[in-house]
């Protein structure tokens, strides 16, 4: 379904009132965007994507099929969410003692250009650093530094990646072979040379 706001919504998708969707965004089959959600421009939401109440999604974000972005999760610009990856938003869920409402949610922030592989799980209350790469099937239970490469269950850092997601190494002075990145105090900084 095309609309006056210059974004595309498939006829099977549901967009609740008070959801805000940016221009040139595409929302595909059987997706549901809940009230108060904000989705930026140029995003792509695959089939069966659920975006919860009051979720904030930046510009140029790609969310693959079968992903739920629950209330309490924020995705900055250029984030990639692989197929069937999982966000949680409550640390100790109990059916007998419902925990509805934002006061129970632990916030999760996925920073600019981070990528999360298929079937990965991001446990709530953590921050995924910019340009970080989370391997398929990983379970992230703690904060992830910028440019970190994480794999496994629980997710362990096995290296560093550049802005393009290619693994990089560092010499004794903490410089990458290309000279564009510096590792200091277990933090990678971009030197602005690319």
What are these regions (language model features)?
Residues 129-132, 145-147:
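Conserved catalytic segment of ABC-fold P-loop ATPases
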Residues 162, 176-178:
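Short cysteine-rich clusters marking metal-coordination/redox-active sites
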Residues 170-174, 184-187:
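Short Cys/His-rich "knuckle" micro-motifs
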